[in-house]
């Protein structure tokens, strides 16, 4: 029986050595150590041994059982280690590879236009000035030659906060505030947000303007046209035609509407320009002497011009945008184009 036990031991350890998976090792445990296994079958023969041999063989059976159990446990541990190593190899991450970069946004078309306009005028000697969006009636209207009952106030529907405070309807109040703080000569542009009760495909209740002001000795209407011609040529192209049409603004005299040759048809006439060949882009004029009086300037000693443009309109013309509301809907499919 001792020979049978030793042979069983050798067979079991050979099977353990050949097993490569945990499942195979569990089958070996069942085959040799299970209730119907080989060791159990041999132990049934202990009763046939003499009283002297029985304890010796019994001790040998227990020793071999423990050895096989230890061998199986060692094999299971090794199998788990191999499985773990294989998983690590298959899921290995190369830490030297670059990571996934988050999607980068881009500047809004309104921001792009404001920056470009400011850069152009900076090259012409203009500095940027700012003012509050909640403005006093005096700065927004009266100082700009809009007296309380002036009919020109009907040109703009205004959001009033109370009797004297309002959401500014243009950035022209920045010109008043700047002239009250500084003496000529001065050249400023004032980009900012303005508010009016108007909303359709070409108007928004909140939009952006850039006002410009130049005051010095001997400034003429010709200087105004020259500055605006340089500006439009740099913004829309060197061959962009410019024309000025008589108009009216309470704070400038004389006043003009500034048109450029249609950027779509090149001045030949199309649906965008209503077959006129021209597109209106801004209003301008020589500063009215009454405005100088409000800020304490001597209208006999200095002269100057002012102009104002809607940034949304400039963006629509520059980028071929048909509906102003697209600029405020935050549609990523639209904004990704810029």
Swiss-Prot record:
InterPro entries: aa-tRNA-synth_II, aa-tRNA-synth_II/BPL/LPL, Phe-tRNA-synth_IIc_asu, Phe-tRNA_ligase_II_N, Phe_tRNA_ligase_alpha1_bac, Phenylalanyl-tRNA_Synthase, tRNA-bd_arm. Its main location: cytoplasm. One of its GO terms (molecular function) is phenylalanine-tRNA ligase activity. Mg(2+) binds at residue 253. Its cofactor is Mg(2+). Pfam families: Phe_tRNA-synt_N, tRNA-synt_2d. CDD domains: PheRS_alpha_core. It comes from the Bacteria. It catalyses: tRNA(Phe) + L-phenylalanine + ATP = L-phenylalanyl-tRNA(Phe) + AMP + diphosphate + H(+). Binds 2 magnesium ions per tetramer. Its EC number is 6.1.1.20. This is Phenylalanine--tRNA ligase alpha subunit.
